[in-house]
Amino acid sequence: NQLTAIRNFIQQEVDYIVLAPVTETGWDTVLQEAKDAGIPVIIVDRMVDVSDDSLYTAWVGSNFKLEGQKAMAWLDAYLEAKGRGDEEINLVDIQGTIGASAQIGRTQGFDDAVEAHDNWTTLAQQSGEFTQAKGQEVMESILKQSGDDIDVVYCENDNEAFGAIDAIEAAGYEVGGEEGQILVMSFDTTNAGLTDTLSGKITLDTECNPLHGPRVEEIIKK
């Protein structure tokens, strides 16, 4: 539990707290406690939604909505290049943990793109909680309902993509970008995600900036 961990750090009188929040909300009280104790808090990766921005010292993270927009712009261009720009395209969005800033931004990028295309339809949109096991479970359920109709699976991180791919292949479908296969998109570009991209199982993996650590170090040194 992140709230418990932060309070433990406050009791230990640490010099800095670096927080990568699971969700955006629910941080006001504990961050106020850290501020009252004189401990700077640096937010990393996902953002927090608080009533007073002075409760944290800095945020080092990514623009998740922009990531989603760029991924969907790539999909648009890819389908055009394949001569499928005017086809009816059915999409599945395996969302991240609901309320996390990465989920909010990447879902918004997805939703905006689908809304802008009359020939794109969202067949299902359900949280995979950013985990492989839940991603597989969600994908298995969706495949039972709509397996033959799915063109694109948009996974909001690599762990979900790994689970989705396992479910797709176990159900007898192929993953990949060619006609007749299910195209899998993902985010983060972990080492395993890059491996699946190079092998063609993931057609697009949008990188999430991995350089947060050095930037946090720079902030602390200042």
Question: Where are the regions a protein language model picked out?
Answer:
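A residue-level marker of the well-folded mature domains of exported/periplasmic proteins
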Residues: N1-K222
